[in-house]
A protein has these predicted regions:
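Phosphate-coordinating catalytic segments in nucleotide- and nucleic-acid-processing enzymes
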Residues: 50-266, 270, 333, 338-373
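Switch/communication elements of ASCE P-loop NTPase nucleotide-binding domains
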Residues: 1-58, 243-373
Length: 373
């Protein structure tokens, strides 16, 4: 089982010298806007990614998934220090896990090259290069080239691999590999398969339907149905036998199914959920969250949940049942990220406060503790 105990982000995107330890089963990542919550979740993914550009692309694309035409190279370069103005680039993340140390480091140089040279050095196939020359209308006078290496450590095994890409690259070839950890973006429920792991598992399917009925009691079944053009649609069957495509339902039902689907994927691993409140009305938090946490425990899934919603935080803390039990282990940790001045804070530009769910619950109750700042 993949389980994160601590992490050090020496350099990644806008985060410098951030160290957090003492993670638990359910970890809430909170903080002000632009405090690094999504970057933190990306850092965890990068630690477990395969040392290849195609795996890195799958992480960088998460921010721009709705806008598929965004440049891979631009997203890739922004993984390094966003304020770094020198040619030499580097990022480094390390962590202690239940299976030993993990570490990833990207080191390289960005430089300008002639447009013709960039085409030849790009990841495009020979056919794509010819198509680019013929269809683009013009070849840029200069382009950017990154050359470097990825160094990864998993336990006692260290791997080093040379990489390169140009600002003309968009499609990055590489084998499709099973991910070790899993991520739910704030808008993932709008575009990904929602039933993949549910419809073929009767027990899991019945659980999903029972949850959906609390949103809409007319729901009787969920399945794939074949349309007239031969495609398969994700559909809901009502108790009156009416076949309704998911497209006519709101985001809440899609978000629930997406979370349940990804939980199954993340069995014996880590699941990160960005902005868990997106698409969900707050009145359903108390119904959904206990089911998600109970399933995560059953499936051995460690959760990292980013949110800026105080209502979501309070609903998650209710799961701790702090009024009725006393025990040493608290399954909930609340990690608050906050921007600071690196010149004052020994080079760190973001610091973390890590406290137990019970601490936040007690202080919210007595002092109206603001955990997000």
């Amino acid at each position: 089982m993949a389980y994160l105990k601590s992490i050090e982000i020496n350099q990644f995107r806008g985060i410098q010298e951030l160290s957090i330890s003492g993670f638990s089963d359910i970890n809430l990542i909170v903080g002000d806007n632009n405090s690094g919550k999504t970057t933190f979740l990306e850092a965890i993914q990068l630690l477990f990614a395969k040392p290849q550009l195609s795996s890195i692309k799958s992480i960088t694309n998460q921010r721009t998934a709705i806008h598929s035409n965004n440049s891979f190279y631009t997203s890739f370069i922004k993984m390094f220090n966003v304020e770094q103005d020198k040619e030499d680039l580097d990022l480094e993340i390390s962590a202690k896990c239940n299976d030993g140390m993990r570490r990833v480091e990207l080191i390289g140089v960005e430089k300008a090259v002639a447009g013709e040279d960039a085409i030849q050095l790009s990841k495009m196939s020979n056919r794509q290069k010819e198509q680019y020359k013929g269809s683009s209308g013009f070849i840029p006078e200069t382009a950017k080239l990154f050359e470097g290496k990825i160094v990864t450590q998993c336990g006692k095994k260290t791997t080093e691999k040379k990489i390169s890409c140009t600002s003309l690259d968009n499609g990055i070839p590489g084998p499709i590999v099973k991910k070790e950890v899993f991520y739910i973006s704030s808008f993932g429920h709008l575009r990904y398969d929602l039933l993949q792991n549910i419809v073929d598992n009767p027990e899991y399917k019945n659980l999903a339907i029972s949850i959906l009925k609390q949103f809409d009691d007319s729901i009787a079944d969920i399945c794939y149905t074949k349309a007239d053009d031969g495609t398969y649609l994700e559909s809901i069957i009502t108790k009156n036998g009416v076949n309704m495509p998911f497209s006519v339902y709101g985001d809440g039902i899609k978000k629930i199914l997406y979370i349940l689907n990804k939980l199954f994927d993340a069995t014996d691993s880590i699941l990160m959920i960005d902005e868990i409140e997106t698409g969900l009305h707050k009145k359903y938090y108390s119904t959904l969250f206990p089911v998600v946490f109970a399933l995560a425990k059953k499936l051995n899934v460690q959760l990292f949940i980013a949110t800026h919603s105080m209502e979501a935080i309070e609903a998650i803390l209710e799961y701790g049942n702090y009024e009725n039990k006393v025990k040493d282990h608290d399954s909930i940790k609340v990690i608050t990220l906050k921007k600071v001045n690196p010149e004052i804070d020994h080079g760190s530009n973001i610091v973390a406060r890590n406290v137990t769910g019970k601490y936040v619950y007690d202080n919210r109750k007595v002092f109206d503790f603001e955990v997000r700042l």
